[in-house]
Amino acid sequence: LADSNITKSALASALKELMETTPFAKITVSDICAKCNMNRKSFYYHFRDKFDLVNWIFDVEYLNHVQIGKNLIGWDSVLHLCNYFYENKDFYRKAMKVEDQNSFINHFRELVSPLMAEDIREILGEQTDADFYVNFFCDAVICAFGRWISQKEPIPPQKFVELLKSCIQVVVLTQERMNS
């Protein structure tokens, strides 16, 4: 297992280094392997494709860190995630632009959607339209994250989270006005 993690980490480092100068779409598995002196067979033993490697980077660097160290909920978890993206903005700025079948955006959606679904179903109950709301808010959050991190100089994470909170408050206030 230790050798496996060393190999995966070497491939991840190679991809990150390549992404500093090369658009993701132009990076091949051969490029990644050449960068860390491995063969393609080693790559494919561990990953399906380069998208799988990007997702593994997020899972190991962020998700495993959260599961091991912090038990964050609510806005604290959003801020923690934003801090991670901000610290790694050069990498995720490029990763979030890719919209292929196995892209990071899709992986991120798979992680965010169940969390949002839980909150939305708690608020709405088991309405038949709950899936619509989950998809709507997932799209909004993922788009907001992508737009934020893609800026040349993204606003600090704390400010971004404050703006997200404000957006939700505006939605709630608008709904209250419409119902009165």
Region spans (language model):
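N-terminal positioning helix adjacent to the helix-turn-helix/winged-helix DNA-binding module
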Residues: 3-10, 129
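Secondary-structure edge/capping motif, primarily at the C-terminal ends of alpha-helices
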Residues: 69, 92-95, 120, 148, ...
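C-terminal peripheral helix-coil segments that are non-catalytic and often amphipathic
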Residues: 147-180
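Amphipathic alpha-helical packing segments from all-alpha helical-bundle domains
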Residues: 80, 100-124, 128-143, 169, ...
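Residue-level recognition of alpha-helical structural elements
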Residues: 74, 97, 101, 126-130, ...
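Basic/polar phosphate-binding segments, predominantly the helix-turn-helix DNA-binding elements
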Residues: 4, 32-52, 84-87, 91-95, ...
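Hydrophobic recognition helices of helix-based DNA-binding modules
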Residues: 15, 19, 57, 61, ...
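An amphipathic alpha-helix adjacent to DNA-recognition modules
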Residues: 8-16, 20, 25-29, 34-37, ...
